[in-house]
Amino acid sequence: MIEKIRAMKNKKGFTLVELIVVLVILAILAALLVPALTGYIDKAKNQAIISETRMTVMAAQTLVDEAYGKKDVGATVTIGTDAAKDDVTKQAIADLAEVPVANIGDITFDTKNTTKIATLEYTKSGKTCKYTANPTGSTEKYVVGAASSK
C-alpha cells in the first residue's frame, strides 16, 4: 500500500487547476485578438472593392477613348446597356475589367472633357465604392461606404 502511494507521488502531470488557468489565459487572448482581426478583415475588403473599382474605371476610360477615336471630331460618346444605341456598354466594361456587370453602377462624364470619366459607382457585398475624378474638399478619389438602396 505504501508503495502504491509513493508511485502516485512520482507521477508527473498537470493538475486540473493548472489546465483551467491555461484555458482562461487562452480565452482572454482570443477575446483580445478577435476585434483586431475583424478590423483587418474590413480593411482588406475595402481595399478589394477599391481595386475592383479602379480596374473598372480604367476599363471604362479605355473603351471610351477607343470609341471616341472612331467618331468624328467633337462627337460625344455614350455609355449604357444597349449595344445598338450606346458606344460603350457596361457589359463591355465588365468584360474588360473582369468584374460582374451587375456591380457597375452609374457612370458620368466630365462636363468640360466629355470623354473623361468623372464618376463611377461600383457595388459589391453590400459596400459601394464611388470614384470621383476631381474630388472637392477631399484628396480621396475612391470612397467606400455602405451600399445605398435605390
Regions of interest found by a model, annotated:
Residues 72-132, 143, 148-150:
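Extracellular/periplasmic head regions of type IV pilus-like filament subunits
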Residues 11, 29-32, 44-47, 51:
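Residue-level signal for short amphipathic helical patches enriched in basic/charged
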Residues 58-80:
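Alpha-helix exit/C-cap motif
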Residues 1-14:
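N-terminal leader/signal peptides at the extreme start of proteins
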Residues 12-38:
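N-terminal single-pass transmembrane signal-anchor helix
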